[in-house]
Amino acid sequence: MKKLFLFFYLSVVSIAAFAAEQFVIFTPAGNHFPLVANGVPCPIYIDSSEDKGVMIAAGNLQQDILQVCGKKPELLTSTSSKRCIIAGTYGTPFIKKLMSAGKIDKKELDGKNEKYILQVIANPCEGIDEAVVIIGSDRRGTIYGIYELSEQMGVSPWYWWADVPVMKQANVYIKPGQYSDGEPAVTYRGIFLNDEAPCLTRWVKHTYGTNYGDHRFYARVCELILRLKGNFLWPAMWSWAFYADDPQNSKTASEMGVIIGTSHHEPMARNHQEWSRKRKEYGAWDYTTNQKVIDQFFREGIERMQGTEDIVTIGMRGDGDAAMSKSTNVKLLENVVKNQRKIIEEVTKRPAKETPQVWALYKEVLDYYDKGMRVPDDVIMLLCDDNWGNVCRLPNAKERKHPGGWGMYYHVDYVGAPRNSKWLNVTPIQNMWEQLQLTYDYGVEKLWILNVGDLKPMEYPITLFMDMAWNPKQFNVSNLLEHPRRFCAQQFGEDQADEAMRILNLYSKYNGRVTGEMLDRNTYNLETGEWKQVSDEYLKLEAEALRQYISLKPEYKDAYKQLILFPVQAMANLYEMYYAQAMNHKLYKENNPQANEWADKVEQAFARDKALSDDYNNIMSGGKWKNMMIQKHIGYTSWNDNFPADTLPKIYRIENPEKAPEIRNTVWRAVAPEPLKRVLDRLRSLQKA
């Protein structure tokens, strides 16, 4: 009995630990601080000497409070209000005064990394009777504290990127006490925008009018990263060049507080497109024959990133994410790294170890490491999963002593064999948790980077990844599903959380069986009834998602469609189409005239696939996400999507079916049981209403 009680207690404690302790409430009680009273918010005070990133976050807090209560608070730079919100960073003049007056314990923040504390303080300074004070150990700590306040007031980190509504509140109160999320477990935590054509690139073109991501786009990305308590970004690089396309990109990220890196095959803060666009001028990407030009290319990258916190990728791969030639040897690559560090020292006028660097052990580079190639002790060693979410190499006890630390490059999007995975989220929640927990347990805690493709529709795995990078110890096998439940409560409301979580968990599980790109008529066994079983499971899930969608308040429907309904409907329809194709082929071989009915079903499902995508691109959220769901996924014949458009699967028809021999009805007569089919038809009609 005692063991059972202990298990229950630990489960409850771990569930409560998924977020910072709740300090915001919406009903008055005792001596709670009135942040918003009867629709009137307190002003925000930021010292004029504060960091630009904190200023930007405070400006966003103004907008967040406006969304919550309908009135925008003032942003003050002088202490002229009886009650206010104060945000500041450890070491700034105003915060020093608070600490000197004994209002804040210096030990809480001294020497800490990206930590914030939030508490209500009486008489923090002359002219202010009471204030909610947010103090960060550094600028990002302050920024995280500001966004934590926003989140607890009801502003989702995904408010813009997934159109999550903000519920109105006339009163917002802060509970007494001191609150903090502590320090992050992983030092650098971020995302990689990758494989971004055609969806993200065309969405950006439509939304911002540019053929590249400019500073307006990256400001939105950086804000999301910071709201998720991340701090790191590998920008998109297929056809874009972050540093060169818009000089304001680097400045924007740096000011906001996001650290920029370049991907595993883009050394020395240079984007691949910068070389590719001038390949005729530069010559071969070959260090043995073109070292002088390449070294100058490297030098310009380091010169350009001066004054930022950016992390430098070192080493060298082939031209354009390709392997180096077979003649490449360890000695040559070690010489590349030696020269790169020499350039870093010459440009920065400091020892190379004072500039953060990472060496990506990706694909063939891991082979060089296994053959004995080594880099200096201060360099972060970046390992990789198998491109499909399964960690395949972790440091042993001796390797874990590497002073520079270890990182992990993890994928929820991939371009490569056996097929691309770019269309939908196919990552089971349990698999990501298990693999990242294993990663952390083996001491990989310096840098975590997630390949997120176009960013949408990977909203939930991005959230899970970032939360695990902040504090993986909060997760265990008993409480894991509380995380997606909390995510769903935040996006759709507490009353919808249980059902939305169940559907999110199931669709992630079902999609993890086989990606949409690899699915075809031969994936499951037709004769044993396996094909019908899995198709029915998905159609049942679609019916359940549609029921919830129809029950939602109108303001939640766009967010629900993006995060739950569309991925369920799109994959359910794909299963329906390929099952129908399998039945068509089977019955055609038997000269069964029902083959023609199944051919019709294939055509109907293929047309519906386009209709679902068109709705996502053009109708949902008023067309805000136009082009974000144009990824090809039907018609693969090799690993790549180098076919012109989605292609109707091959079907056969029996000519003159009335002359075919009479064949008894088969058990395969419907894609789903008739009652389920009728329910689905009814729900789909209500969805359109």
Language-model regions, residue ranges each:
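Contiguous, structured surface segment used for ligand recognition
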Residues: 20-182
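An acidic-aromatic substrate-binding cleft motif
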Residues: 158-210, 216-236, 404-407
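Structured mid-domain segments that build the active-site/substrate or prosthetic-cofactor binding neighborhood
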Residues: 226, 231-234, 240, 383-389, ...
